[in-house]
Amino acid sequence: MSDEAEFPPAPQVAGTSLDGTRIFTVSAEENARLCRSVGVAPAADGTAHPVWYYVATQVAMGKTVAGVCETCEFDVEDGPMMGSSGVRFSGPIMVGQPYKVGGEILSLVRKKSRKLGVMDVLTYRLRLHPADGGDAILETDNVWVLPRKELA
Amino acid sequence: MSYAVGDVIAPFTINAVSEDAMKDWAVFLADPNPIHLDVEVVKAKGLGDRVINQGPINVAYMMNMLMAAFPDGTIEAMDSRFLDNVYGGDKAVASGKITAVDGNRVECEFSLDIEGRGTVNAGTATIRLNA
């Protein structure tokens, strides 16, 4: 019998929309503050620090982190862990430019690891678009590990 | 500037990971998870005895290294894996090297290492060199 047969399957959440309705804009003040917090000066050409890819998509997606966890039938208080984050840019994030977020959950896969026991591996994809329409300027795939203590 | 496979990327160093920065990021991320803000919560959860840096801050350190190394380029793609926690007060060093050069694109691999503990993040990036 395989390990996977020892515990119930993960909730079927692939395809869940993470489209947001909120408009997200990086202000010059926020960008300067973020840059200082990570040890660099803000760019002089109007581009925001590229790590805003993560912040903007998380804040303006259609669910909170706790809400995404709830969709996966996971209590955020149980401690989701970041597994990986990938981003592909087709253009820079600009200070003062309004953006909106589209996206979806790609998969939720239940696994067993020696270190963490039973866990669900959540992968979701988010895109950052100009708020007035047009192609996404970036696409990001984030992977979270959701330890299933109750199944350990 | 010219780039070659095997070139080492100049490191980017944070001498002491800032707990105040974590407070800023709790606002940026609209996520007041107390493991980034309250050491007593970290202790209670058995996660250590210092507050834990938000993961994307570690990504920013590695981006800083890449942006400094390629002032004539932009990050086109980047993937990073989170291998361990970074704590307040840690000395963090992002470093890397060039693994491929193809026309106006440079491929890199990199890591973020903590003094005394080793690698906590690792990944790859593609830099597009501007004409």
Residue ranges and their predicted role:
Chain B
Residues 35-40, 76-77, 105-106, 118-120:
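Glycine-rich loops and low-complexity Gly/Arg-rich segments
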